[in-house]
Swiss-Prot record:
Post-translational modification note: Glycosylated. The glycosylation has no role in the association of this PLI and PA2 enzyme.
Main location: secreted
A UniProt-annotated Pfam family: Lectin_C
UniProt record similarity statement: Belongs to the alpha-type phospholipase A2 inhibitor family.
Gene Ontology MF annotations: carbohydrate binding; phospholipase A2 inhibitor activity
Subunit and interaction comment: Oligomer. Homotrimer; non-covalently linked.
Cysteines paired by S-S bonds: 83-160, 138-152
Compartments, as annotated in UniProt: Secreted
Signal peptide segment: 1-19
Glycosylation sites: 122
Protein name: Phospholipase A2 myotoxin inhibitor protein
Role summary: This phospholipase A2 inhibitor binds directly phospholipase A2 in the presence or absence of calcium. Has anti-enzymatic, anti-myotoxic, anti-edema inducing, anti-cytotoxic, anti-bactericidal, and anti-lethal properties against basic and acidic phospholipases A2 from Bothrops venoms.
Keyword Metal-binding: no
Amino acid sequence: MRLILLSGLLLLGTFLANGDETDPDGQVLNSLIETLMHLQREFANLKYAFLTVHKARSFGSGSERLYVSNKEIKNFEPLGDICSQAGGHIPSPQLENQNKAFANVLERHNKAAYLVVGDSANFTNWAAGQPNEADGTCVKADTHGSWHSASCDDNLLVVCEFYFIL
């Protein structure tokens, strides 16, 4: 959308710089201005629609972060690239409501998924007896949102975390 707006501005700028002797009444210029204004309104409408959907999904999950699965099953190695290419990150719930939103996805799919726990995490949800590095060096969440040590070779549900700074 921004590319279209920039193209319109470029055309308008070129037109103004060169002038147009075949359009003395300025019909082309007026048409370009009208088109640009229409595109600006459309962009504003799309932005509003996007923000409305984001707010509704955030409201429904109780979290400003969205957790989404592509339904694939993978080990930990490709997960960072998969999420990054989608514009997200490996899940890293920082608050209880974020962990609940993450767990809702796992419960819907009846599968566990990887997450990343930061060194300075203020929130954790380790299951009893966890973490246990004997089970592995990665971390997975079960369908209830409890965290467990896991092998990084386990094939788990691919879930990515998305959040928007507005």
